[in-house]
Each structure stands twice: as structure tokens, then as C-alpha cells.
């Protein structure tokens, strides 16, 4: 299977859409894999790899304001996904798989089939949702202002009802209004399947009073593996040690 970085995808306004691509031998179809708000293409590589193992070319891409995309967060998010879908048509039919905001964009796209994972179907999140988007979700986003995402969500057109195979996925412990919105939307679609994920769900429970003061440190710890600075520092160090430094075996057996 071939794996490569893609640099030739161009959005409607001329910006490059950075992407990684898996290409199985003899593939006749492809899937654009799109992250949610605050994510990046690297976070979607696991899903893309599993899709590629099923014989489909899989392209994980960065939306503007995220990852290596050169443009700041703005209203052209769907342009980035559409440019990726158009580019992938060289392989044949094209699907779109997206999470959260990426799932909403996938449902708005021209893809032949769509898998939307916990899609953000509401344009007006709850107070709790707004707080998470502004205070937590946008840490890695290059945005004109912390609340730009709220303006973008409000400006999105209604999610279209399209007659195509559509998979809608939510977690059993997902956000309740999101689950209701997903199931209501599924009822309006001609060819929709709904899947509920039950494994590896966080369970509700009481928290100690000091948890909010600890939360930012925990989130920084969890997010480090997907930090763009880590993507530069760790690979560079490893390559320097293994490919450029003098070779030498380390005796791990001990005396």
C-alpha cells in the first residue's frame, strides 16, 4: 500500500489543502476523511488507515485554521473539503467521512456516500457547548477570535437532505441534544443508517471540588500527542538519532 503526502489540492480561493493519502493497489474508490473543530489530519490517520485496509484510497486533510493549512479559520471550510473530493475523483466514486464539524461538512458535501461521526448539526450550541468550543476546543486553531467558530456555525446553511447512502454514528454517552438532532435528521433522509457506539464510553460520576483547577493541565497532557510542535520535534529528534548519529547498539540485557 502506498502512503504519501499530498500538496497539490487547491481550495476555491487558491489555498493549498494539506493532506495525507493511503492508496491500496487497484483501488476504484476513495474517501475524504475530515476532522472536527480543533482537530487536524494527523488525528484522523487511524480511521484513514482502517478505511484503506478495506481497499479504498483514504485522504486525511486539514481544514483552514487547522494543522498545516495556510489560511486562518474562516467561512471556506466546505471549499477545502470539496476541493479534496474533486481531487479524489481520479480514483472513482468518492465518499466523505467526518467527525463533529467535519461530519456536518461531509453531509453538506457532494460526496457519493457519507459517514458522519457525531456530526455537529446544530448551528446554535448550548451554553456548555459554546464554552467548550471557545475555551477548550480551539486551543490549536488559528482563528481571528476565540468565538469565530460560533459565527461560522451560525452562518452555515441548513444541512441538505440528499438521497445517497448515509451512515450517522453517535456514542451511547454522546451529547444528548446532538443525539436527538442526529436521529431527527436521519428520519428525514431517504437512505440513512444510524449506529450507536457503546464501547469505551465515559461514564457520569461525581468529581472532587478541585477538578476544574486541574482540568487544563489534564487537557494539555492528553492533547500533547496531537500537538503540531510535537509533530516537528519528536520526528526530527528520532531521525537525527537513528539516521544521522553514529550507529551503536545498546545493551539492554544488563550485566
Language model regions located:
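The alpha/beta-hydrolase serine catalytic core
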Residues: 95, 104, 108-254
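Short beta-strand element of the alpha/beta-hydrolase
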Residues: 28-36
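Alpha/beta-hydrolase active-site loop signature
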Residues: 38, 62-67, 121, 201-202
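N-terminal cap/lid segment of alpha/beta-hydrolase-fold proteins
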Residues: 1-26
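The serine-hydrolase catalytic nucleophile loop
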Residues: 37-49, 180
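Conserved alpha/beta-hydrolase
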Residues: 48-68
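Alpha/beta-hydrolase fold nucleophile elbow
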Residues: 90-100
Amino acid at each position: 500500500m502506498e502512503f504519501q503526502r499530498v500538496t497539490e489540492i487547491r481550495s476555491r480561493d487558491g489555498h493549498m489543502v494539506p493532506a495525507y493519502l493511503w492508496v491500496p493497489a487497484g483501488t476504484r474508490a476513495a474517501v475524504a476523511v475530515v476532522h472536527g473543530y480543533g482537530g487536524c489530519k494527523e488525528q484522523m490517520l487511524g480511521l484513514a488507515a482502517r478505511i484503506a485496509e478495506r481497499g479504498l484510497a483514504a485522504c486525511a486533510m486539514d481544514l483552514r485554521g487547522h494543522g498545516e493549512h495556510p489560511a486562518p479559520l474562516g467561512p471556506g471550510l466546505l471549499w477545502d473539503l470539496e476541493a479534496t473530493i474533486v481531487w479524489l475523483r481520479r480514483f472513482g466514486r468518492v465518499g466523505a467521512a467526518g467527525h463533529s464539524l467535519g461530519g456536518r461538512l461531509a453531509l453538506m458535501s457532494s460526496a457519493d456516500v457519507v459517514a458522519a461521526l457525531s456530526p455537529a448539526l446544530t448551528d446554535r450550541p448550548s451554553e456548555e457547548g459554546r464554552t467548550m468550543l471557545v475555551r477548550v476546543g480551539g486551543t490549536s486553531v488559528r482563528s481571528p477570535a476565540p468565538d469565530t467558530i460560533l459565527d461560522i456555525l451560525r452562518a452555515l446553511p441548513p444541512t441538505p437532505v440528499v438521497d445517497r447512502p448515509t451512515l450517522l454514528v453517535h456514542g451511547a454517552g454522546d451529547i444528548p441534544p446532538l443525539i436527538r438532532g442526529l436521529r431527527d435528521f436521519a428520519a428525514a433522509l431517504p437512505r440513512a443508517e444510524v449506529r450507536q457506539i457503546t464501547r469505551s464510553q465515559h461514564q457520569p460520576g461525581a468529581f472532587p471540588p478541585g477538578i476544574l483547577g486541574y482540568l487544563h493541565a489534564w487537557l494539555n497532557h492528553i492533547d500533547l500527542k496531537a500537538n503540531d510542535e510535537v509533530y516537528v520535534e519528536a520526528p526530527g529528534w528520532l531521525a537525527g538519532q537513528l539516521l544521522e548519529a553514529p550507529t551503536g547498539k545498546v545493551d539492554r540485557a544488563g550485566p
